[in-house]
Amino acid sequence: GGGVGDLGVVGESALFRAMRAARTGRMGSIVSTIQREQDVIIRDESRGVMVVEGGPGTGKTAVALHRAAYLLYVWREVLSRTGVLILGPNSAFLEYISQVLPELGETGVVLSTVGELFPGVVPVGVESVVGREVKGSVEMVTILARAVRRYQVVPDEPVVLVVDGVGLEVSPGLVRAARAAARRSGRPHNEVRGLFADFLASGLARQWAGLIGADPLGGENLLSAGDVAELYDDVVSDVGFVGLVDELWPVLDPRVVLAELLSDRGVIARVAGDYDEVTQGALFREVGDLWSASDAALVDELAELIGGFSGVDEGVGDGWRRQVADAQGVLDVLSSSASSDLDDVSDAEVLSAFDVVDAEGLARRQEVREHRSVADRARGDIRWSYGHVIIDEAQELSAMEWRMVMRRCPTKWMTIVGDTAQTGSPAGVDSWAETLGPFVGDRFVTHRLSVNYRTPARIMAVAERVLGLFAPDAPVGVALRGGDDGVVRFCAAGTDPWAVLPREEGRLGVVIVADSRKGETPGVLGVSDVKGLEFDDVVVVDPLVIVDDSPQGYQDLFVALTRATRSLVVIGELPG
């Protein structure tokens, strides 16, 4: 057995093997076609969205990686500052890339799965098919907005706040008006907390002024605007008022909001009332359950709705706050020293450090520049804007995940690689136009790779039988490896897969089962584990179970059948 480096991501090795094995007269024209198609994609310098389509074995991933290297060379000055994000389908794929292209790690490239894109959210939990579909749907935008609004509280009864011995009534009407003013701003929750508090404090200051400044003769209030402003200051500095604002409009953390939402069936029912019980149940998880891959996009959406949240590295944030506090201490010392040192008017005209810089500015001047690489800084910052984004197996991204990715690339300079015939996620892509339309309209270009140089024609013939059942009009790449290349065997259901898997030195074999069955047998992989990977020998177990395992079951089976480069064994009946 080999390490991850032996797992074959569809790459140049397959092309070279095919070229060495090919003996037909059309080889020259086919290689020319491959080179022409790939070169156009790799060297396309347009600064927009490019979709690269192609069936199994057409080298989509290899082209995407070559394009990454090309862009990093041509646009080095821009991309060395902004970084490049490469999203892959699984950790094995990303580890392979980091091994075969180690130089990418030195040029500001961040490798990630979409489920790991939000800092601090580590997807370990297993998500049900219905859960993935629901969490991936764009309807979650409305559900999450409702979840945030739950924290913007209006009390059922008036609350009496005692400030300097005076009882002030915080009525539901006043809170409702403050909430409406904050919401009208259209800004995120945490960022309008100050506006909410200001409206509330202003109302209480006016109420206080009415109590103590009323003219006994019925004239105008005896307090001046300055007096009312002082009352306002007394209200906002009152501990009770600060605590009340915390209750009515708390500072939120998107991860906490999502965890509290998903672990409370009652809250789910209130914010997702349009869903039936089964669908609502798919959102529920027990308190303390681990994050799943679908959760990252939801946390990211909440971060957008909540605002005032820079990322996850609280340690870095705490360090910065300490730096600012230390800098303020230095300025305070300088200020007090200066006031005692000034002997005459001319000295007072001398500019000192505290006259031209505040604490935050001084702290920033002392900060060690570029102490982390571009990739490290980008990886930990949810507001980072990447110069370019490359997405492999992009057909798997849900509507919510596309929203998250698009936020990472405001310029929309992206290379999107995928094949909708292989979409395994129930929330994945059916149409590039429908998926990309909300973000870029029709402003994207599409390239198609037409030559399958990895999968032997014999093996593709089996896969194409399945493809015809769900996408009969889908284009199929011309198989370069024809003739006697490739072995296909069919075995009865119940056959021991390990007994029929070839065991030859230097060849990598795998047994593929339905995702729901992979925990039953040690050593096997589920369909979702083999996305983007190639193997010499493949055994596919129980095709009908794979089909029944997911709403995208036919696509999953198509993926499983097209992972082999030398031999394919099918245990059990094929559909149709």
Where are these regions (language model features)?
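Pre-Walker A adenine-sensing motif
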Residues: 32-44, 377
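Conserved helicase motor core of SF1/SF2 NTP-dependent helicases
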Residues: 77-82, 91-135, 339-388, 393-576
